[in-house]
């Protein structure tokens, strides 16, 4: 049996649980729990997605979050030599995120959530600092906004923008 192109692509994707949250509702018979999960999906080569889902069972929330993340996949075009071409500062709600390119061998210098996103995107050398809100969803959205807003080096050179080497 041969595999279709889509199933082959999905096999390469790595899925990580970023945050799991449990909520409880007090009802007549006791407490009723529900779960929410924030899931990251990436291939380490520039394809990245995130998904958020809720369910009454933890495994269902994780499964639904993974499906949502695969539907939300995006390609980060501006990656080069394991880093980003320029510095970027992004705001999303209360979260701010600063990403700076780093020299080869530096590694990923970032907090745990942002580090996981950058690793799954395939970035090897970068310095990141988050300010403001540490709400996981806001940090993830800020990171995706920063990564999708990057301009490739050739576009910057064509415009005549200054680039630090």
UniProtKB/Swiss-Prot annotation:
UniProt keyword annotation of Calcium present: no
GO cellular component labels: small ribosomal subunit
Keyword rRNA-binding: yes
Family classification: Belongs to the universal ribosomal protein uS5 family.
Domain notes per entry: The N-terminal domain interacts with the head of the 30S subunit; the C-terminal domain interacts with the body and contacts protein S4. The interaction surface between S4 and S5 is involved in control of translational fidelity.
GN (gene name): rpsE
A molecular function (GO) term: rRNA binding
PROSITE patterns: RIBOSOMAL_S5 (PS00585), S5_DSRBD (PS50881)
NCBIfam families for this protein: rpsE_bact (TIGR01021)
Signal peptide bounds: none
Record-annotated S5 DRBM domain positions: 13-76
Keywords: Ribonucleoprotein, Ribosomal protein, RNA-binding, rRNA-binding
GO biological process: translation
Highest taxon above the source species: Bacteria
Subunit structure of this chain's protein: Part of the 30S ribosomal subunit. Contacts proteins S4 and S8.
PANTHER family xref list: MITOCHONDRIAL RIBOSOMAL PROTEIN S5
Organism (species): Chlamydia pneumoniae
Task performed by this protein: With S4 and S12 plays an important role in translational accuracy.
Protein name as catalogued: Small ribosomal subunit protein uS5
